[in-house]
């Protein structure tokens, strides 16, 4: 059954309004009101990328931390919250991630292009993601969660 992404609460918790009208900024958060929640990597905006079925952007991103193709496929097929639980930190020391057996420098243009291509695939294939993104036209989009250290 499809979750109601325009709801104001989920699992007994109120979703938060992540829009700041003073700065015209929307903070993308899974616990935010629509469209913030649908733009989150944790949202189940399924797409197919490079022959892999990805149930969420989080699944794709977490899969990059694993060298083994079978493990990547498994993580790609997970929805956001479950995929996030598969996170590992071993890649951080040498800043190498993996895609389909190929090592990629996390700080490289090749990595940036891979991420752009995955987001483009999700945009093209997920009407819900596209519609939510179009709702933010003219807004500044941020993600003020996580670590500030890019390494």
Positions of PLM-derived features:
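Charged, low-complexity intrinsically disordered segments
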Residues: 1-151
């Amino acid at each position: 059954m499809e979750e109601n992404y325009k709801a104001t609460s989920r699992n007994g918790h109120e979703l938060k309004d992540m829009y700041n009208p003073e700065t015209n900024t929307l903070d993308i958060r899974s616990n935010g009101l629509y469209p913030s929640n649908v733009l989150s990597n944790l949202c189940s905006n399924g797409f197919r990328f490079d022959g892999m079925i990805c149930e969420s952007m989080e699944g794709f991103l977490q899969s990059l931390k694993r060298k083994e193709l079978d493990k990547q496929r498994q993580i790609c097929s997970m929805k956001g919250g479950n995929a996030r639980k598969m996170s590992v930190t071993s890649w951080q020391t040498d800043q190498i991630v993996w895609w389909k057996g190929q090592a990629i420098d996390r700080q490289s243009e090749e990595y940036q292009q891979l991420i752009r291509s995955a987001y483009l695939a999700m945009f093209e294939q997920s009407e819900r993601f596209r519609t939510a993104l179009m709702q933010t036209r003219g807004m500044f989009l941020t993600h003020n969660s996580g670590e500030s250290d890019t390494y």
